[in-house]
Amino acid sequence: MDIKQALKKLVASIDLSTEEMISVMRIVMTGGATPAQIGGFLVALRMKGETLDEITGAAMVMRELATPVNIDVDYLVDTCGTGGDGANLFNLSTASAFVVAAAGGRVAKHGNRSVSSSTGSADVLEAAGIKLDITAEQVARCVKEIGVGFMFAPSHHSAMKHAIGPRRELGMRTIFNMLGPLTNPANVKRQVIGVFNGELCKPMAEVLGRLGSEHVMVVHAKDGLDEISLATETQVAELKGGEIREYIIKPEDFGMQSKSLIGLSVSNAEDSLLLIRDALGNRRGQYAEKAADIIALNAGAAIYVSGVAGSLSDGVEMARDAIGSSLAGEKIRELAAFTQYLQ
C-alpha cells in the first residue's frame, strides 16, 4: 500500500490493517513521502482515530529502524508520557526517573524535546547540564553506574527526521505521541506510561502486550493529565502476567490529600528544573511540597512496576523516602557530572 491509497482510506474513515500500517510507516520513515503527505496522513489518522492494529504496526516499524541500547540489569523501567494533555506541567516523568534510581530501580528514560508542551524531557535535562549527545554504549553505562540514563529520541530514531518538520508545523498531538513510549530503544519490558485520553489506557496496554512487555501501568487522570494526578482519580490499565486489569486510584489511597495542580505548570525548561530541584531538595518554595507529592505518586508506580517494590503502596512509600532523603536530587547532579565526563 502506498501513502496515497492510505490517505484515501483514512479520509473515508476506513481503518488500516497492521500490515497496511507497516507498509505506510516504512514509506514515511525512509523518506518516501513528502512533508505534505506526512502531515495529511497524521491529521487524517487522528481525525479517524488510531486503532490498536494501526498503533501496533507503526510501533513495529519504529522499533525495527531504531538504534538499540543493550542494557543487562535488573529492575529496568521507563517512565514516559505521550504528551498532548495541554497541562504544561513540570517534567513529572523526568523527575520521577531520578526518584526511581534513588530507590534502587534502573531507568532507561526515552524522550525528546518539546513538541506539544512548554518543555520536553530533553529540554529540562539539558538545562540541568546533562549531556544528551552520547552513544548507546554510554547510555548503558549511565544506567549501570548512576541508575538512570537518557535516550534522546532523535539519536536512536534517526528515521524520525522525515516526520519532524510536519509534526512541528502541525503543533498538535499525533500518533507519534503514542509511539514514543512504545518504542524505547532499550526494549524495556516494564513501563509506566501516561496517555492523553482515558480511552487509550487499555489499548496501549494491549499493544505493549503484543510487543512483549512484562509489567506495565498505563495511566490517565480524570483532570486530563497523562500522569497520576494529585488532584483527582486516575484511571489505570495494568498489564502483568499477560493479563490486563483496570482500576481507579486516588491520592487518599496512599495517605495523601487531594490538592489542586495550581503552581505546577511551567512555561520553560528552566522553571521546570527549578521546581524539580526544589521538590527533590529542601522544598522551600510555595509549591514544592505539592510537587514532591505528585512526583512520589508517579515514581512510586515505576518503583512497583520495576519489581523493586511488591505493591503500588510500597512503591509510593519508597519514593517518598527517596525524596525526603535528598538522594533523588543528588542523582540529577550525578548524571550531569557523569555525562560531562564521558568521552
From Swiss-Prot:
It catalyses: N-(5-phospho-beta-D-ribosyl)anthranilate + diphosphate = 5-phospho-alpha-D-ribose 1-diphosphate + anthranilate. Binds 2 magnesium ions per monomer. Its EC number is 2.4.2.18. Mg(2+) 2 binds at residues 226-227. This is Anthranilate phosphoribosyltransferase. Disulfide bonds: none annotated. Anthranilate 2 binds at residue 167. InterPro entries: Anthranilate_Pribosyl_Tfrase (IPR005940), Glycosyl_Trfase_fam3 (IPR000312), Glycosyl_Trfase_fam3_N_dom (IPR017459), Glycosyl_Trfase_fam3_N_dom_sf (IPR036320), Nuc_phospho_transferase (IPR035902). Catalyzes the transfer of the phosphoribosyl group of 5-phosphorylribose-1-pyrophosphate (PRPP) to anthranilate to yield N-(5'-phosphoribosyl)-anthranilate (PRA). Anthranilate 1 binds at residues 81, 112. One of its GO terms (biological process) is L-tryptophan biosynthetic process. Homodimer. Mg(2+) 1 binds at residues 93, 227. NCBIfam families: trpD. The lineage of its organism: Bacteria, Pseudomonadati, Pseudomonadota, Gammaproteobacteria, Cellvibrionales. GO terms for cellular component: cytosol.
